[in-house]
Amino acid sequence: MEVNILALIAVALFISIPTAFLVIIYVKTISENN
């Protein structure tokens, strides 16, 4: 099976960007509580 590198990159970005966004919001909320 041929692996499409662009597809892998697209999936990686699609997963990592929202995850990073949620982590940033989570950290912001914690620092505000402190």
Curated annotation (Swiss-Prot):
GO BP, sorted A to Z: photosynthesis, light reaction
Membrane spanning stretches: 5-25
InterPro entries cross-referenced by the UniProt entry: PSII_PsbM, PSII_PsbM_sf
Membrane disposition: Single-pass membrane protein
Keyword Membrane attached: yes
GO CC, one annotated term: chloroplast thylakoid membrane
Top-level taxon in the UniProt lineage: Eukaryota
Keyword field: Chloroplast, Membrane, Photosynthesis, Photosystem II, Plastid, Reaction center, Thylakoid, Transmembrane, Transmembrane helix
Entry's localization field: Plastid, Chloroplast thylakoid membrane
Biological role: One of the components of the core complex of photosystem II (PSII). PSII is a light-driven water:plastoquinone oxidoreductase that uses light energy to abstract electrons from H(2)O, generating O(2) and a proton gradient subsequently used for ATP formation. It consists of a core antenna complex that captures photons, and an electron transfer chain that converts photonic excitation into a charge separation. This subunit is found at the monomer-monomer interface.
Protein family according to the UniProt entry: Belongs to the PsbM family.
Complex and partners: PSII is composed of 1 copy each of membrane proteins PsbA, PsbB, PsbC, PsbD, PsbE, PsbF, PsbH, PsbI, PsbJ, PsbK, PsbL, PsbM, PsbT, PsbX, PsbY, PsbZ, Psb30/Ycf12, at least 3 peripheral proteins of the oxygen-evolving complex and a large number of cofactors. It forms dimeric complexes.
Name of the protein described by the UniProt record: Photosystem II reaction center protein M
Gene (name only): psbM
